Structure formats: structure tokens, C-alpha cells
Amino acid sequence: MSTLRLLISDSYDPWFNLAVEECIFRQMPATQRVLFLWRNADTVVIGRAQNPWKECNTRRMEEDNVRLARRSSGGGAVFHDLGNTCFTFMAGKPEYDKTISTSIVLNALNALGVSAEASGRNDLVVKTAEGDRKVSGSAYRETKDRGFHHGTLLLNSDLSRLANYLNPDKKKLAAKGITSVRSRVTNLTELLPGITHEQVCEAITEAFFAHYGERVEAEIISPDKTPDLPNFAETFARQSSWEWNFGQAPAFSHLLDERFTWGGVELHFDVEKGHITRAQVFTDSLNPAPLEALAGRLQGCLYRADMLQQECEALLVDFPEQEKELRELSAWMAGAVR
């Protein structure tokens, strides 16, 4: 029986694809070597321990119908569209070795006519007239008896959209001498005009087979039929939930302030697991009572725009004469936390 397994997803749903990845990783025999190929429609994928409100422009994402997906590996936030090819290599220990999977991807690129090399811990770069440019980034996850390496290859991604949805870490950029995320990446189509997702998948597959000296039939994973994977429904429900994608953010504090015609407002929130654990409201309004009441209502509230609006508008019952102020406050809060 072959120790290789090849899976290809025809879904563009990031929650579906990450749920498939998680299920395969959890139930695969430790003797198996797996290659999973996939891609996502417009999505910001964040690392397991990242704060989406800090890393992403969540308001712009909502306006543009861009999804947020939290992966189970570490690392930073990335933007995916259909111009990215995603790959995941899995293996049991002690065989799991990310240098092997990296070499498979490099061999695939070489077969396509692209000379690339590994750079740092996570990137693959190509040399251009403007200097080294990143074409691939990766992240990793290990458990006691297995590990995986997953990453993306930029084929013809809309690089102008990176800045729309990601808030770059200025300290990180300064430490690396980088002026912007956009300036240091390039698409493979700049080197191979017309290259397609299917061609890249075929090249990676052939390099995978060549390395292990075996061939297997591909298993096509489709959203039209629930994958025959243990606990898939539960894993997908978790992967697509607000509690996982937003609620798993590390504890953080958020200060919001605004000046209205009726006074200035400062909101101080402490947030843990997506819930407000402490809310303080400061104002120079001539009638601070509704804002003082709001602070109490927000304690324990989900840190989600619709929930904040709901709590604010509930005060209209007790403070009908402040309807204008409360509706202005509600709309501002909802926009500020998206």
C-alpha cells in the first residue's frame, strides 16, 4: 500500500479548505506523506495567535466581502485570492522535514523554468532587476508525532490589494529594512507569462512523486459532497465560526475616541477571547447618564459591531430624549470596531 496521498480541492472557500487540512492532519497515519493543493477566493488568513483587529482592516474587508480565516499554524497575516496557489505537505515524525517540502517546491519551480531559492525561515525568492522578490511564504505546525508545512505561491495575485486589507507592522518592516509589503513581492506571471494554477499544481505533484519514487491517483475534494473525513462537519463549523476567527485573539485593549456636536467620547475596552471584560466610558457631554449606563451594558458583550450597536440602541428605552446622540454613537462604534 502506498504511503503517499495526494488531495486537490476544487473549493475556493478558505474555511472549507482549512477544515480539510485540519482533518487530514489529525487522522493521517504517521507513516503517510500527504500533499494537499488548494486555493482561496478573497481572504485574509491570519496566524493562530494573531489579533485580527490589529492585523487587518476589518471594516474594509467587510465592505469588500473579504473573509477572515484563522489558521492553526503560527506566523503573520496574508491576503489570498485566486491568483495564489496553496500547498500543504504533511508527514509523520521523524520523517517530517520542512527542508524536504521546500526542496520539492523549488524543484517544481525549476521544472517550470523559474530559478528560486529559500530565504530566511519562511520565504522563497527570485532574483529580478530590482533585487530579490518574494514569490512564496510558508508557515509550519508540529505535534508530538507529525508536522505540516503549508504555504502559498504568488501566480497572478492582485498585489495592489495587499495594502487594502493588511495593517503592516511598522516595527517589523523597519527592523528588516523594508519600505512596504507591496515592494518586496512579485508574481510568477512576471517571469512566466500565462502560467496557470493547474500547471503549478501539476509541477508540484510531479516533484512530489519524483522525490518519493511513487505515484498515486489524486483525490478531488469538493464542497458539493461532504468530504469523507472524520469529524469534518464539526471542524468546518469551528473553522467558520466567529469564535475561532475573531474570538481566539489574544487579550488586548482598545481605545476609541470621537468628538460629536454634543460632546467628546472616549471608550476604553479590555477584550479577552472576543468578549469585553472591562468597559470604561469618558465624556464631557452635558448629559453623561446614557454613556455611564452603556459602560455597564458592554461588560461581557461580544466585541462585535452588531452586538455593540444592539447594546447601545437598547438604551433608547431608558433614554428616549437622547435618541439622536445614541444613534450617532451606535453608528460610530460599529464602524470603529469593524
Swiss-Prot record:
Q: Which organism is it from?
A: Escherichia coli O6:K15:H31 (strain 536 / UPEC)
Q: Where located?
A: Cytoplasm
Report the EC code(s) recorded for this entry.
6.3.1.20
Tell me the subunit arrangement: Monomer.
**Annotated metabolic or biological route of this protein:** Protein modification; protein lipoylation via exogenous pathway; protein N(6)-(lipoyl)lysine from lipoate: step 1/2; Protein modification; protein lipoylation via exogenous pathway; protein N(6)-(lipoyl)lysine from lipoate: step 2/2
Positions of ATP binding: 71, 76-79, 134
What sequence ranges are listed for the domain BPL/LPL catalytic? 29-216
Q: What is this protein called?
A: Lipoate-protein ligase A
Task: Give the GO biological process terms.
Answer: protein modification process
Record has Ligase as a keyword: yes
Please tell me which top-level EC class this enzyme sits in.
Answer: ligase
Give a Pfam family name. Answer: LplA-B_cat
Q: Where does (R)-lipoate bind?
A: 134
